[in-house]
């Protein structure tokens, strides 16, 4: 008797039930998710929305742009204007330290999108001593990335000159005009800088540096009172990551639409494809557990301002139970088996 032949239909049936969406009769329930910026890093959320992956599990989701960084999205979360936010995570940690019941639910990736791009004469990080390094603003994700890289190199912040330029395009102009010797750039701007001949001298992805990027945050009260609804939302969220990683053409088209990049702008479309490749192959994680290691990085930074923060447990700032349930049930594994 062919035992493999017997078990194949059983395996197929199990896969069907694991991925079975919410019944159509279930009323669609509105949830709003706020994004801190318009960025390619939001690709998986846009894909989940555009491909109807939240509706598939009986949840009506509206994706809104809050802007103004993580602090503003956390404020909108606390006010009840949104039920979930996607941002850098530090805002949620700061609010929790003040006693506000925000919580980190997932981290789609935890290694930085920033790279230090330097003028051609700067060969290695050691050549950065005494040089002007541009960031957007103090307290930004790029500023944190720079501080972490300097620490990894056993360099102090006062051994370089940190200057602010407000935006990635402005920093690139600063490099061109010699107003900065290096700049902490993000996607897709560092691809443009590389094309112009600037050199990569620091990349957190290759330096084993973890910090919060693209964290999904919510309120503990919502998680307690609406666990089933949140779990269904999370199914759409993690399936969005899987769809993004597995469907390059459609994902790029959705990002192109959201970023308002016209098809005739070949250079911009090329940079968008490079951004997709980096996100899909290197950054996005299949099982987006909240990263305790990345949370600890933020706590260590904040402990420089308040030593008492060293006593806090990084695990207490996150609720991994939703991702764990989807992981343990085989739901996430099944998404990649299709």
Name every feature range the model reports, one short phrase each.
Residues 27-177, 181-187, 200-204, 209-210:
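Short, glycine-/small- and polar/acidic-enriched structural segments
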């Amino acid at each position: 008797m062919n035992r493999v032949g017997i078990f194949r239909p059983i395996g197929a049936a199990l896969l069907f039930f694991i991925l079975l969406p919410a019944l159509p009769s279930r009323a669609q329930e509105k949830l709003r998710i706020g994004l801190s910026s318009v960025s390619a890093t939001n690709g998986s959320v846009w894909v989940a929305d555009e491909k109807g992956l939240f509706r598939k599990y009986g949840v009506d989701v509206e994706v809104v742009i809050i802007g103004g960084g993580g602090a503003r999205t956390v404020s909108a979360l606390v006010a009840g204007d949104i039920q979930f936010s996607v941002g850098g995570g530090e805002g949620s940690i700061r609010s929790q330290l003040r006693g506000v019941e925000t919580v980190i639910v997932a981290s789609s990736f935890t290694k930085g999108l920033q790279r230090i791009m330097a003028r051609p004469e700067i060969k290695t990080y050691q050549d950065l001593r005494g040089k002007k390094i541009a960031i957007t603003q103090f307290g930004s994700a790029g500023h944190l990335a720079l501080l972490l890289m300097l620490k990894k190199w056993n360099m102090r912040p006062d051994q370089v000159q940190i200057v602010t330029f407000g935006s990635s395009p402005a920093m690139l102009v600063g490099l061109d005009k010699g107003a900065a010797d290096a700049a902490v750039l993000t996607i897709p701007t560092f691809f443009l800088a590389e094309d112009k001949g600037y050199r990569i001298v620091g990349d957190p992805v290759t330096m084993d540096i973890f910090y919060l990027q693209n964290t999904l945050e919510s309120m503990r009260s919502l998680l307690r009172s609406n666990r089933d609804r949140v779990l269904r939302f999370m199914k759409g969220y993690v399936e969005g990551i899987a769809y993004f990683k597995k469907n390059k053409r459609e994902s790029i088209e959705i990002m192109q639409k959201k970023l308002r990049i016209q098809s005739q702008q070949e250079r911009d479309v090329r940079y968008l494809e490079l951004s997709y490749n980096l996100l899909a192959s290197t950054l996005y994680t299949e099982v987006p557990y909240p990263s305790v290691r990345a949370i600890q990085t933020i706590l260590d930074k904040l402990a420089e301002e308040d030593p008492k923060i060293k006593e806090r447990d990084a695990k207490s700032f996150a609720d991994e139970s939703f991702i764990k349930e989807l992981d343990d049930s085989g739901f996430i594994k099944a998404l990649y088996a299709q």
